[in-house]
Each structure stands twice: as C-alpha cells, then as structure tokens.
From Swiss-Prot:
Family, as annotated: Belongs to the complex I subunit 3 family.
Taxonomic source organism: Squalus acanthias
EC annotation from Swiss-Prot or TrEMBL: 7.1.1.2
The protein, known as: NADH-ubiquinone oxidoreductase chain 3
Pfam families: Oxidored_q4
TM stretches of this protein: 8-28, 56-76, 87-107
Amino acid sequence: MNLIMSSVAATALISLILAFVAFWLPSLNPDNEKLSPYECGFDPLGSARLPFSLRFFLVAILFLLFDLEIALLLPLPWGNQLLTPSISLLWATSIIILLTLGLIYEWLQGGLEWAE
C-alpha cells in the first residue's frame, strides 16, 4: 500500500512539474508566430464563411464508413468460437457486400473523383 501511495505521489509531482514547465517556457520568448492561433492550415483571422468542399466532405464520410467496417469486422476471428460460427461469417459477408455495393455506386456516380 505504501508503494502504491508513493508511486501515485511521484506521478502527480512529476505531472505538476511538467505542466508548470510547459506553461512557463513559452512565456519566456513570446513572438507573433507563437501568439497567433493555429487552425489546421486555415487562416483564423479571415472570413468564416468560406465555401466548404463537398468532395472533401464525401471522401471524409466514406473514410468514416470504411473505418467503421474495420471496427465491425475486428472481432470476427473470435466469432469462430461461438456455437454456430456460420452466423458470424454470414454477418461479416453481408457487411462486406453492402459496403462493396455502396463503394461501387459511389464510384459509378463519380463521387470518388477529386477533380473533374
């Protein structure tokens, strides 16, 4: 118990020291570049009403769908330990077929073309 308390105290102390140093060091040498906000490549001082690329939005949504596919298919190897492993294989196959049909549809509609 004593070892746990001392390691928690040491961790808290090191975290506080690092947080203090992280806030203290940038204030030693401020300049315009360090004090300006950074917004992922966008100019934060410009107009907020810039048009958003619909193509980029579509590619981002497709990425999220295929990322979700990986999350759904990740436990598939453990599905073989069920009483009826064919059910997990059926669900995985149906997910893959559905996403493949959606990808083919987007491809035929030209949604994957970045520039026309």
